């Protein structure tokens, strides 16, 4: 049989999509579907080698600690990771040479490419802003994808020695200019009928560039998740961002 996979958050919408994708893959074997009321020991009992975690920010750290301590690698799509949480994961992984953790703000290949293209474009434009649009049930704002996109843009601008973005705003309603992520404005929209969408707008004298990405259903995440599951054994330790598995 193939790689033995457990899915955490298996009863959720994304979790159900991942369960179906694993079941349809000849090289993967689904050995555990873990819901909120299930014991994580089922992963060990059923010999899971890799878990996929689409749970909640409140649950994910406990899940990761358990998996790492039991030698199970993890592909994580759950949001809510800040620098402190990432450092904690690195600490747990110390000395665990055969365990990998992939944390990705987005597993849709189109979203990964949007982040990569945005970082490439950043040094050519005076201004950049990020708009993310999601369904109204999303718990966090702005999205991890938008934050990661803005951080990449800011890092590229810093590397290029660029000045702060021009903005003469003196009076504004609170929040009207969005959240500042490393100096890049990020705007969050929550609206019925949407799933997961992002626009990155760049501007300089006489021209603009808009990079736009849309995920119309949760099936868009499955191919990227399976890339992670199939390749995590070659990437021990913590990796943040699916682009590192795609050679981008």
UniProtKB/Swiss-Prot annotation:
Belongs to the DapB family. It is an enzyme of class 1 (oxidoreductase). One of its GO terms (molecular function) is NADP binding. The active site is at residues 134, 138. It comes from Corynebacterium glutamicum (strain ATCC 13032 / DSM 20300 / JCM 1318 / BCRC 11384 / CCUG 27702 / LMG 3730 / NBRC 12168 / NCIMB 10025 / NRRL B-2784 / 534). Its EC number is 1.17.1.8. Gene3D superfamilies: Dihydrodipicolinate Reductase, domain 2 (3.30.360.10), NAD(P)-binding Rossmann-like Domain (3.40.50.720). Pfam families: DapB_C, DapB_N. Keywords: Amino-acid biosynthesis, Cytoplasm, Diaminopimelate biosynthesis, Lysine biosynthesis, NAD, NADP, Oxidoreductase. Catalyzes the conversion of 4-hydroxy-tetrahydrodipicolinate (HTPA) to tetrahydrodipicolinate. One of its GO terms (cellular component) is cytosol. InterPro entries: DapB_C, DapB_N, DapB_N_CS, DHDPR_bac, NAD(P)-bd_dom_sf. It catalyses: (S)-2,3,4,5-tetrahydrodipicolinate + NAD(+) + H2O = (2S,4S)-4-hydroxy-2,3,4,5-tetrahydrodipicolinate + NADH + H(+); (S)-2,3,4,5-tetrahydrodipicolinate + NADP(+) + H2O = (2S,4S)-4-hydroxy-2,3,4,5-tetrahydrodipicolinate + NADPH + H(+). CDD domains: DHDPR_N. HAMAP family: DapB (MF_00102). It is found in: Cytoplasm. NAD(+) binds at residues 9-14, 77-79, 104-107. It comes from the Bacteria. Pathway: Amino-acid biosynthesis; L-lysine biosynthesis via DAP pathway; (S)-tetrahydrodipicolinate from L-aspartate: step 4/4. GO terms for biological process: diaminopimelate biosynthetic process; lysine biosynthetic process via diaminopimelate. (S)-2,3,4,5-tetrahydrodipicolinate binds at residues 135, 144-145. The keyword NADP applies. The gene is dapB. This is 4-hydroxy-tetrahydrodipicolinate reductase.
């Amino acid at each position: 049989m193939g790689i033995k996979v457990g899915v955490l958050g298996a009863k959720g919408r994304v979790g159900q999509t991942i369960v179906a994708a694993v079941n349809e893959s000849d090289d993967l074997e689904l050995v555990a579907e873990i819901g909120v009321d299930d014991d994580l020991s089922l992963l060990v009992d059923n010999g899971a080698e890799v878990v996929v975690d689409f749970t909640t920010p409140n649950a994910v750290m406990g899940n990761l600690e358990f998996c790492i301590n039991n030698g199970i690698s993890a592909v994580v799509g759950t949001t809510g990771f800040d620098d402190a949480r990432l450092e904690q994961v690195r600490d747990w992984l110390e000395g665990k040479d055969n365990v990998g953790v992939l944390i990705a703000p987005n597993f849709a290949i189109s979203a990964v490419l949007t982040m990569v293209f945005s970082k490439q474009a950043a040094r050519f434009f005076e201004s950049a802003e990020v708009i993310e649009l999601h369904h109204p049930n999303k718990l966090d704002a702005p999205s991890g994808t938008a934050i990661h996109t803005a951080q990449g843009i800011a890092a590229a601008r810093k590397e290029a020695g660029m000045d702060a973005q021009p903005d003469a705003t003196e009076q504004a309603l609170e929040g009207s200019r969005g959240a500042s992520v490393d100096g890049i404005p990020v705007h969050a929209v929550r609206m019925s009928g949407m799933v997961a969408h992002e626009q990155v707008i760049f501007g300089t004298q006489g021209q603009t560039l808009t990079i736009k990405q849309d995920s119309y259903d949760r099936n868009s995440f499955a191919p990227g998740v399976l890339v992670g599951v199939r390749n995590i054994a070659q990437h021990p330790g913590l990796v943040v961002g699916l682009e590192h598995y795609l050679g981008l």
